[in-house]
Amino acid sequence: MNSQQNKLPQQPQQPPSSIVDDDNWKSQLKLPPRDERRQTEDVTATEGNDFDDLHLKRDLLRGIFEKGYVKPSPIQEKAIPIALAGRDIMARAKNGTGKTASFLIPALEKTDPTKDVIQVLILVPTRELALQTSQVCKELGKYMNVQVMASTGGTSLKDDIMRLYNPVHILVATPGRVLDLAQKNVANLSNCHTMIMDEADKLLSQEFQPLVEQLINFLPQQRQILLFSATFPVTVKSFKEHYLQQAFEINLMEELTLKGVTQYYAFVEERQKIHCLNTLFSKLQINQSIIFCNSVNRVELLAKKITELGYSCFFIHAKMVQAHRNRVFHDFRNGACRNLVSSDLFTRGIDIQDVNVVINFDFPKHSETYLHRIGRSGRFGHLGLAINLITYEDRFSLYKIEQELGTEIKPIPPVIDKSLYAA
């Protein structure tokens, strides 16, 4: 890296925190404690590049290292240079392997904070993911003066309109809300040359695709589109052919499930499930767990039962008031509670590092749902456990999901080795 190019100009108004000495800037970083947990090849099988090799702005590197990132993961190593070169990307990588940073880092690098226009639009399918992504973006860009805004349905439209009177450089949003703002001429996307779609398979489902296609009409002709997902159904491929220019394809999905997640099933009758769950709670070394149910009603009933058994428990689902959902998400992430009962609202992209156990209280019908659920444990190459409670009616779904994902879900042993999932 050319050290002359990287030196910041010495100007009298430069705040003292701007580090000018090339040899000295790393020694002044405020690094978090090093995570010494063992990691799997999902994040360690790289070509050996460092973040320093990516020719990023000094202030962005400071944010990256202070966030605790040490070296780029495989998806980051592949995607960041291509995104910085301005190519469209269609990237497929497992959940929990660093996808978010692989698009946030180039987004921040390419943003010019001196221009008071929206330059990057990041679309996500859920409100929780929008809040999480915008928070990570703010943390990575904390020295860059880049203004990041999250905008989602379920919150005050008036507040969003007021916020957009001030500069916003990167907008993280759900499709319906940002389309509403664009149609009202409040969110001006005419200078937004980069659109990123996280969880692209969900964004291109029947629910969202018409909104996404309308949004593209508000973008300039010269634009870059980045698609990131763990699964790429036919809808994504046809969207790519229609809207992406000579997209660079990245596929890090030789196998679909995370290497660090051990999967078990237990055959139970419906009426035995609570008893089985109680046994698991007493025997497992749980840091934090997420327990999935197939309906909103069952989420609330199960959370009540778990609390009656004497275990700390929150619940979250799509029919809750947004402010309540935000509070549950925030408190659970901060470790206020050990167990969270959830509907499939909470399967996509949500990153809580302390979750080491996922329990499918109700087994899902589709392999895609299963994949996203178990990806809540074993985040960023760490170890995790997925336990599936299987009724007689679920046996065909179990077989189908094993076949479709090419994975093995084993019968649960009498004792589970703690080294498989506990740091």
Swiss-Prot record:
<feature type="domain" description="Helicase C-terminal">
    <location>
        <begin position="260"/>
        <end position="420"/>
    </location>
</feature>
<keyword id="KW-0694">RNA-binding</keyword>
<protein>
    <recommendedName>
        <fullName>Probable ATP-dependent RNA helicase ddx6</fullName>
        <ecNumber>3.6.4.13</ecNumber>
    </recommendedName>
</protein>
<dbReference type="Pfam" id="PF00270">
    <property type="entry name" value="DEAD"/>
</dbReference>
<dbReference type="InterPro" id="IPR014014">
    <property type="entry name" value="RNA_helicase_DEAD_Q_motif"/>
</dbReference>
<dbReference type="InterPro" id="IPR011545">
    <property type="entry name" value="DEAD/DEAH_box_helicase_dom"/>
</dbReference>
<dbReference type="GO" id="GO:0034063">
    <property type="term" value="P:stress granule assembly"/>
</dbReference>
<dbReference type="GO" id="GO:0005634">
    <property type="term" value="C:nucleus"/>
</dbReference>
<keyword id="KW-0547">Nucleotide-binding</keyword>
<dbReference type="GO" id="GO:0003729">
    <property type="term" value="F:mRNA binding"/>
</dbReference>
<feature type="domain" description="Helicase ATP-binding">
    <location>
        <begin position="80"/>
        <end position="250"/>
    </location>
</feature>
<keyword id="KW-0539">Nucleus</keyword>
<feature type="short sequence motif" description="Q motif">
    <location>
        <begin position="49"/>
        <end position="77"/>
    </location>
</feature>
<dbReference type="GO" id="GO:0000932">
    <property type="term" value="C:P-body"/>
</dbReference>
<dbReference type="GO" id="GO:0005524">
    <property type="term" value="F:ATP binding"/>
</dbReference>
<dbReference type="InterPro" id="IPR014001">
    <property type="entry name" value="Helicase_ATP-bd"/>
</dbReference>
<keyword id="KW-0963">Cytoplasm</keyword>
<feature type="compositionally biased region" description="Basic and acidic residues">
    <location>
        <begin position="32"/>
        <end position="41"/>
    </location>
</feature>
<dbReference type="GO" id="GO:0033962">
    <property type="term" value="P:P-body assembly"/>
</dbReference>
<feature type="short sequence motif" description="DEAD box">
    <location>
        <begin position="198"/>
        <end position="201"/>
    </location>
</feature>
<comment type="similarity">
    <text>Belongs to the DEAD box helicase family. DDX6/DHH1 subfamily.</text>
</comment>
<dbReference type="GO" id="GO:0006397">
    <property type="term" value="P:mRNA processing"/>
</dbReference>
<dbReference type="GO" id="GO:0010494">
    <property type="term" value="C:cytoplasmic stress granule"/>
</dbReference>
<dbReference type="InterPro" id="IPR001650">
    <property type="entry name" value="Helicase_C-like"/>
</dbReference>
<dbReference type="GO" id="GO:0017148">
    <property type="term" value="P:negative regulation of translation"/>
</dbReference>
<comment type="function">
    <text>ATP-dependent RNA helicase which may be involved in mRNA turnover.</text>
</comment>
<feature type="binding site">
    <location>
        <begin position="93"/>
        <end position="100"/>
    </location>
    <ligand>
        <name>ATP</name>
    </ligand>
</feature>
<keyword id="KW-0507">mRNA processing</keyword>
<dbReference type="InterPro" id="IPR000629">
    <property type="entry name" value="RNA-helicase_DEAD-box_CS"/>
</dbReference>
<keyword id="KW-0067">ATP-binding</keyword>
<dbReference type="InterPro" id="IPR027417">
    <property type="entry name" value="P-loop_NTPase"/>
</dbReference>
<feature type="region of interest" description="Disordered">
    <location>
        <begin position="1"/>
        <end position="46"/>
    </location>
</feature>
<keyword id="KW-0347">Helicase</keyword>
<dbReference type="GO" id="GO:0003724">
    <property type="term" value="F:RNA helicase activity"/>
</dbReference>
<dbReference type="GO" id="GO:0016887">
    <property type="term" value="F:ATP hydrolysis activity"/>
</dbReference>
<keyword id="KW-0378">Hydrolase</keyword>
<dbReference type="Pfam" id="PF00271">
    <property type="entry name" value="Helicase_C"/>
</dbReference>
